[in-house]
């Protein structure tokens, strides 16, 4: 945990405050004459989950359990959680939501979490997609750090008006048939550029990520050896070729320009778009209803996002916490989370629910969104991410943006990114 030393130092104040808060709440309960039979669980979450409604439902049916939700920003919550478990006592919640990109880091500290296998995790494993379950499991299958919540199977959003302007099909089945490979995507991009002057995508990162996420091996093998030359270099070369030919734009993910471009109709497709992107586009481009649709992504779906519910060792109520999270992640509740907040279920039983499959979205030309994402979810491959995944991802993203924005040489940018990656890995 040496690499987390600075993080621990800078976040200790948070731990102290949370610990004091917990002590004050406990004292308040005693002075109010609260029952000793009441179990109080602190639950840390991030993002829009809809869990507050489900927690109320659970507490109504289980009056001996009180659940306190602490909702925060994603990075802050993960940093504070690691600080709390590193401190060894006080401050950590009974239940913590952990995002997929952070799971490997916390698995390195699995001695600070309860092994959910000991509480019956294997009895509920069949509820979930195999690849999702494996993401929170040790290599030998003996340790399960969390139960799966939502997932982010990827598709391809597209602007029907831009496709039509280019003289291309706009029916989602016809679009999927025309763009059924990355070679076909490239050829379609040339047509769109020629007919409209617009790129097929505004984001180099999304194009690269889409190809990367279809691979069974990406940045590291299971021995944590860097393998990018043999895996994602081809995706990088494909993306930079399209950048240099003016077929892919220059917008950086999550920057204001990326959001505003959704409303402008300045590009044709958004490859690698997961279920949660549905709401993101609506928020950034509310006046474009009916101009978007959703098709299959060329050559198979990947996954972008999703979380797990874990139980830190500092909890005094692991059995009660497990009982709650096994209920919350069950198919019935995952369906409710989808209906409330749009969290896409990781429980395939939901994919057979008639009401679920009938879900359409008027904004996306009445696309059967649940059906499309369910089909994508079942084609995702299991991928080992590695504890240093974000280091590689950040540096390759920087290289792509330098090529797109600065006109930098792709090979020089790749070599520089590899050098930066290796330098950082040596310090871990």
What are these regions (language model features)?
Residues 279-282, 307-390, 412:
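Mature extracytoplasmic/periplasmic domains
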Residues 244, 354, 358-359, 374-428:
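Conserved C-terminal helix/tail region of periplasmic/extracytoplasmic solute-binding proteins
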Residues 99-155, 164, 183-186, 289-296, ...:
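Hinge/lid segment of periplasmic solute-binding proteins
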Residues 36-47, 65-70, 94-95, 145, ...:
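Short, well-ordered beta-strand elements
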Residues 57, 61-128, 146, 165-167, ...:
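Extracytoplasmic "Venus flytrap"/periplasmic binding protein-like
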Residues 60, 68, 121, 138-207, ...:
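Helix-loop-helix "hinge/cap" segment bordering the ligand-binding cleft or interdomain interface
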Residues 1-40, 60, 419-428:
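Short, low-complexity disordered leader/linker segments with a strong preference
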Residues 52-59, 103-105, 207-214, 231-323:
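Extracytoplasmic/periplasmic substrate-binding proteins
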